[in-house]
Amino acid sequence: MTEDSDDVTLVRRCCGGDRQAFGTLVVRYQKTVYNAALRMLHDREEAKDVAQTVFLKVYENLGKYDPKFKFYSWIYRIALNESINALQRRRPTEGLDLDAPDGEPGPEESLGQRQAHDGLQRALMTLREEYRAVVVLRHFVGCSYEDMGEILGVPEKTVKSRLFSARQLLRKALQKQGMTQ
């Protein structure tokens, strides 16, 4: 039995009231959900909160899951949406922290690197959610175009188009900051 078909079986059991089946799904996907949130938020406590919210939403909406799609993609999309919601709740001066979680820049990091990092963070935060999501999924999570399309619920061509547009918008935002040639 593949993990996909096993997930569908677990979802059906959950919908039938089997709490142990839901516990199995939580154990199977808790690291995936937490890491997805952590990569977007770069805050361990906030990522834990988002992960809890994700599993609550998953439990409440299991009846809406369409087994034609991978459960992984469905839950990852919920995690991504909840992470974006958490980013929006932050104060405007806070943003997408690209440092290692809870990490401070090391002594080897030069002022120029720090300025470039801060400039990129500011530029990313100027992007609309749909563009920021593709940049984060591709360049920070390392998703394939196919996986991104499934997670975002759009065709692969749309993913590529959004990523192209996002890169152009990032380039313009960085130019406004005097960060590119």
State each model region's role.
Residues 63-67, 77-96, 113, 165, ...:
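Arg/Lys-rich amphipathic alpha helix in sigma70-family domain 2
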Residues 35, 49-56, 69-81:
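Structural recognition of an alpha-helix C-terminal capping motif at a helix-to-coil junction
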Residues 3-4, 85, 92-117, 144:
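Internal acidic/polar
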Residues 1-3, 15-24, 34-53, 156, ...:
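Short, charged helix-capping/linker segments at alpha-helix termini
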Residues 88, 127, 132, 167-181:
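Short, Lys/Arg-enriched C-terminal cap helix and immediately downstream tail that follows
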Residues 15-16, 39-42, 53-70, 89-91:
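Sigma70-family region 2
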